[in-house]
């Protein structure tokens, strides 16, 4: 998987405030058990270079706050999978390009983004400014609709979705999942926080239940019964009648022995990635995509309790 795509599908990049090479392997195990496999540490933090060298075998490890080409060379030699430079530095960008490693320069203004785009970059880093962060990001996205943004600081699991909900955002560096290098007894807590963050990012919720019928007339009658009894307004939506938004009555035998269940997610690409990590299989012939190429809907390969299950974009 290409690095930018890996960042996008993970969504969450765990920020390591105090890197410790001795804890790299247990940290990687704890994070991966929670569904996360990308980390970022500031390269000027004590022990950062050794941590990246130790963790790059297990995780996609990024080096942040790179200020000089020399620092970039050290980070790349240590095994950094991506670089976040402190500004738009053409020499750092060139060094990374030679190694086929993404360079994501920190961009604070439209002029910064323009300079990065002029150097051929399609993704940059953006550090939010408190509560004004989402508005500032929206302004940059309006000026540069083809640019993608890595959110690089000041984000927690409680605030990340304000950014991850934006289609231009690759991922967020999220603080608080790992506050310090985890000792052995902290591994379970790291895994728990990672799982909680993933579920918060995906924001799964039941969207509707699907009922299979043999034909349009039966579907009409079935949806009509729900309208009559419960006041769920019937609506013909082409391939199915809906009773409100809760019940989809198919006009033919469709997926699922008993019907289907739709589970909505904030981002279907990220949901599919996490579910595959958990062992789920997908029927990719059922996949539908948004005009921009993002996954919109896809069915699981296996039924659950006799129901087909599909993941649907919120």
Per-range role (PLM):
Residues 14, 31, 75, 124, ...:
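Conserved, mostly hydrophobic/aromatic
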Residues 44-46, 210-248, 277, 288-296:
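Core segments of cupin and vicinal oxygen chelate
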Residues 3-16, 198-223, 256-263:
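N-terminal beta-strand motif that seeds the catalytic metal site of vicinal oxygen chelate
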């Amino acid at each position: 998987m290409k690095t930018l795509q890996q960042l996008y599908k993970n969504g969450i990049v765990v920020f390591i405030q105090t890197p410790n090479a001795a804890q790299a392997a247990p940290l990687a195990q704890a994070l991966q058990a929670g569904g996360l496999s990308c980390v970022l540490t500031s390269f000027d933090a004590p022990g950062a270079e050794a941590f990246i060298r130790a963790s790059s075998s297990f995780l996609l490890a990024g080096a942040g706050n790179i200020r000089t080409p020399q620092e970039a060379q050290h980070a790349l030699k240590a095994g950094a999978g991506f670089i976040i430079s402190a500004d738009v530095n053409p020499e750092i960008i060139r060094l990374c390009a030679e190694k086929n490693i993404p360079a994501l320069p920190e961009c604070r203004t439209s002029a910064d983004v323009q300079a990065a785009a002029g150097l051929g970059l399609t993704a940059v880093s953006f550090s939010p400014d408190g509560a004004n962060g989402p508005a500032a990001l929206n302004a940059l996205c309006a000026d540069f609709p083809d640019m993608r943004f890595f959110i690089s600081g000041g984000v927690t699991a409680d605030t990340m979705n304000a950014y991850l909900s934006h289609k231009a955002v690759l991922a967020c560096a999220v603080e608080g999942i790992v506050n310090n290098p985890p000792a052995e007894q902290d591994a379970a807590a790291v895994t728990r926080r990672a799982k909680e963050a993933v579920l918060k990012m995906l924001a799964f919720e039941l969207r509707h239940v699907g009922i299979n019928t043999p034909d349009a007339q039966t579907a009409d009658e079935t949806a009509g019964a729900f309208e009559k009894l419960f006041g769920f307004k019937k609506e013909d939506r082409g391939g199915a009648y809906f009773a409100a938004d809760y019940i989809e009555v198919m006009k033919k035998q469709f997926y699922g022995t008993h019907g289907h269940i739709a589970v909505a997610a904030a981002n279907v690409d990220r949901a599919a990635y996490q579910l595959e990590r958990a062992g789920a299989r997908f029927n990719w012939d059922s996949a539908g995509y948004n005009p921009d190429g993002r996954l919109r809907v896809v069915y699981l390969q296996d039924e659950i309790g006799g129901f087909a299950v599909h993941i649907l974009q919120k």
